[in-house]
Amino acid sequence: MTDDGVDRRRMLVTALGAAAALPLAACASSDSPGLEFRSPHVTDAPSARNVKDFGAIGDGVADDTAALARAADVGDASLVLYLPAGKYRVTAFPALPDYATVLGDGGDVSLITCDTDTILIELRKQNRVRFSRLGIFMSGPASTAVLLSNCFRCSFDAVVLRGNHLSDNHPKFVQQRGVVLEGDTGGTAFINCDINNFGTGIVTSCIQNYVTSSKLTSNYVGVLGTGNDHNAGLALTNVEFVSDRDPRTTVNHIRVDGASNDWWLTNVWFEGAEIALSIGDLKRGGPSQFGMSNCKVAARDVGVDLIYCRQPYLANVIFDKDLDRAPTDIRVDPTGCPEGTAINLISTNADDIRPGVFPDGWTVISRDSMHTPYFAGTMVGRAGASDADIFQAQGPDRAVRAAILASGAWLSERPEAGVVLKDTTGGYWRLTVSPEGALGTAPLGRQRPRG
């Protein structure tokens, strides 16, 4: 951009500013020439109860616990609680009724801080409580930011939850928890949220809750599925799990430690963990279903560790490395995960993921091959418009050994690999043909041929 272009823009901005100042000057009182613009009292919920109207200071020094309690005390009435920009130091958070809404001005400007070992926000048997545009910072080594038990359809939108776990202070804060979902809590949604620096970011022992367009950073364990009662599950979409390279910061981004329910991951990014995903336990069990689609996985040691899972499914997953040395992209225990599906997995650490990584019971489709344990029902190969083979059997060098032609005829390309028949006494014979076209047989013995 030329200086002339910049000057023209500056002139335009100056002209617009002067034009905008005219009506303001006309409205100003002549006896208050120093009056500056003052932001009106604005919120998207005009009926909200502003905590500063009930004595909250919001300077990060004063204890605002009692003021928040007064603001939230509405009896049987509906509650919309508003925390304007500020830093509110508390030791407890008030109880909230069903359908309450708690609003701030932004996750980094309306900040609630708590330095005690407590569960700060605790909801039990409540419905559709909403939190939006708030920040919560916990510094108690065994504290929990949010706990929901037997709650339904609660939501967190643009909320920042932050603990105190760092590599430098490990393991002091590994007991800190960001969110705990327990009981029969369901339908909880975390949208555009940040959950950072906890011992465990999210602990869930219940099914059917959702994390969307959010980020979990530098938690020792990002998400823990626990309970071992076939119940824990979670759906994550457009989520980032990130951390640094220090092994004390993050050990797992997702860990499922026993018998659980459905886990669904779509468009999820993982980087900066020893083992990015550790799924199941050989002695305790694992998910009834685990699915990953369109994900990127990087790790220091193992990308995806499938230890126990009834029905794992991975599609369009790319594996990468965090350090200079390549990790194990995917590790599958043949006892705990004998069956599963893997489609279009690629790796930047190798030319391709070897089919031998997966147990024989898996269906694996890669960019140039397919493995499946069996086909059920009638298998159909249909001839195309040309005379191309319907089927080919190739050797490791990709040379054709046998084929089914477009006409349906069988073709063997090797004289020593003709049709093998078994007689009524259990002996095997190979059909042969002489250069003159005379048919014959060659005995192969009673042991089933393998080559």
Regions found by a protein language model. Give the residues of each.
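N-terminal export signals
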Residues: 2-4, 10-31
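C-terminal trimerization/auto-chaperone modules of long, extracellular attachment fibers and adhesins
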Residues: 27-43, 363-432
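Acidic Gly/Asp/Thr-rich repetitive segments characteristic of extracellular carbohydrate-active
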Residues: 51-82
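Short, T/G/N/S-enriched strand-turn elements that build extracellular solenoid repeat scaffolds
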Residues: 69-74, 89-97, 225-226, 279-281, ...
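N-terminal extracellular ligand-recognition/capping segment immediately after the signal peptide
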Residues: 73-101, 105-117, 134-140
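All-beta strand scaffolds that present successive hydrophobic residues in beta-strands
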Residues: 83, 101-105, 129-133, 154-157, ...
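Parallel beta-helix/beta-solenoid
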Residues: 101-106, 121-167, 191
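Extracellular beta-strand/beta-solenoid scaffold signature
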Residues: 113-122, 138-148, 168-182, 194-206, ...
